């Protein structure tokens, strides 16, 4: 019977995730994941982008209260902008909350001045991420007081769909953008593993508002997908599939793979065979210097093998405990499904 585990164990798995920040743009990062099976770059990139832009928790202002103002179609004495424009500006205030409960912030200003987000009194539980963001312009000798309620949530919640129950008279619900991720783009390029050059490389560009690091946002999105997909695994694995999981080895099972099963050039394969290197475990115990002393084995062959070893998170010069095992042929056959 065909082993079920071959459906996932035979696929190449990404072994490199690189994060690169942009010094000129705060809270923006480039994330590179490789290698991926052909087509998986688009599959994962699209899924990650959707989750990043819709499902992460963040903080936002959900309602405001201004003395003597009962609705958004009013005007505030001494304020250049009308209430609708002030609300629009308040929607652009970016927050980070350190507690799950809602908090009420205060804003007090005396003109003439430009009222900014940094003038909001937040307390210790809330942090303003864009303090220079303009809320309104206040005229000379005029005062402005405002109470702002902020909460934790996800996505974009319209004021008409707000979960604020029975707001007091004079308190105005506003649209709330909770998502800490501002933008996500991705592209897919080819990458090489050994002699195969058409594997996928996923490159993502993620920018947040500072409430969450891009690296953390990507990790949370991946965890959300993992939790959602877990339900679809509805089959029982065969005993031979479970065997690989229950047995413990003091080293990676990939070391039991024979080197003649690797996709090596003829020159590299012959060099390993002539040097009596049979298993990957035999190979990784050698240093790069040892390999370069092998007859007819040059730098090109070395780099070729290094790329293949990286696919399994292996390298030259490894210290492998208990190698070689006495029953190496039996172990190699038993663990064959875990690395094929």
From Swiss-Prot:
Gene Ontology biological-process entries: DNA-templated transcription
Reaction catalysed by this enzyme: RNA(n) + a ribonucleoside 5'-triphosphate = RNA(n+1) + diphosphate
Main EC class the enzyme belongs to: transferase
Gene3D superfamilies in the cross-refs: 5' to 3' exonuclease, C-terminal subdomain, DNA-directed RNA polymerase, insert domain, RNA polymerase, RBP11-like subunit
Keyword Lyase: no
Gene Ontology CC terms: cytoplasm; DNA-directed RNA polymerase complex
CDD domains registered for this protein in UniProt: RNAP_alpha_NTD (cd06928)
EC number(s) given by UniProt: 2.7.7.6
UniProt GO MF annotations: DNA binding; DNA-directed RNA polymerase activity; protein dimerization activity
UniProt xrefs under SMART domains: RPOLD
Region called Alpha C-terminal domain (alpha-CTD), residue ranges: 251-340
UniProt-annotated stretches for the region Alpha N-terminal domain (alpha-NTD): 1-236
Any single Pfam family the record assigns to this protein: RNA_pol_A_bac
HAMAP family for this protein: RNApol_bact_RpoA
Subunit structure as annotated in this protein's UniProt entry: Homodimer. The RNAP catalytic core consists of 2 alpha, 1 beta, 1 beta' and 1 omega subunit. When a sigma factor is associated with the core the holoenzyme is formed, which can initiate transcription.
UniProt free text on domains: The N-terminal domain is essential for RNAP assembly and basal transcription, whereas the C-terminal domain is involved in interaction with transcriptional regulators and with upstream promoter elements.
Family, similarity comment: Belongs to the RNA polymerase alpha chain family.
Protein name, entry field: DNA-directed RNA polymerase subunit alpha
């Amino acid at each position: 019977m065909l082993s079920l585990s071959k459906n996932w164990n035979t696929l190449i798995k990404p072994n490199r995730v690189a994060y690169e920040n942009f010094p000129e743009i705060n809270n923006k990062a480039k994330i590179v994941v490789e290698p991926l099976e052909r087509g998986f770059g688009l599959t994962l990139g699209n899924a990650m982008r959707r989750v990043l832009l819709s499902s992460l928790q963040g903080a936002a202002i959900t309602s405001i209260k201004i003395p003597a103002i009962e609705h958004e179609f009013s005007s505030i004495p001494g304020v250049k902008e009308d209430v609708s424009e002030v609300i629009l500006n308040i929607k652009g205030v970016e927050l980070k909350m350190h507690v799950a409960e809602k908090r009420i912030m205060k804003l007090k200003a005396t003109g003439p001045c430009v009222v900014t987000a940094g003038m909001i009194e937040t307390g210790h539980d809330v942090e303003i991420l864009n303090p220079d963001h303009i809320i309104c312009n206040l005229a000379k000798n005029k005062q402005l007081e405002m109470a702002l309620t902020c909460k934790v949530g996800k996505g974009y919640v319209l004021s008409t769909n707000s979960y604020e129950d029975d707001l007091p008279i004079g308190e105005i619900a506003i649209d709330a953008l909770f998502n800490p991720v501002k933008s996500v783009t991705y592209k897919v390029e080819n990458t090489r593993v050994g002699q195969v050059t058409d594997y996928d490389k996923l490159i993502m560009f993620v920018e947040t508002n500072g409430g969450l690091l891009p690296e953390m946002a990507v990790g949370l999105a991946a965890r959300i997908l993992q939790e959602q997909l877990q339900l679809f695994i509805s089959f029982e694995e065969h005993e031979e599939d479970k065997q690989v999981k229950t047995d413990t080895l003091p080293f990676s099972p990939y070391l039991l793979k024979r080197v003649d099963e690797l996709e090596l050039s003829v020159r590299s394969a012959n060099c390993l065979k002539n040097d009596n290197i049979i298993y990957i475990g035999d190979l990784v115990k050698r240093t790069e210097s040892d390999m370069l002393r092998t007859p007819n084995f040059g730098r090109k062959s070395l780099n070729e093998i290094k790329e293949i070893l990286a696919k399994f998170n292996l390298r030259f010069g490894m210290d492998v405990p208990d190698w070689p095992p006495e029953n190496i042929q039996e172990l190699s056959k038993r663990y064959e499904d875990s690395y094929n």
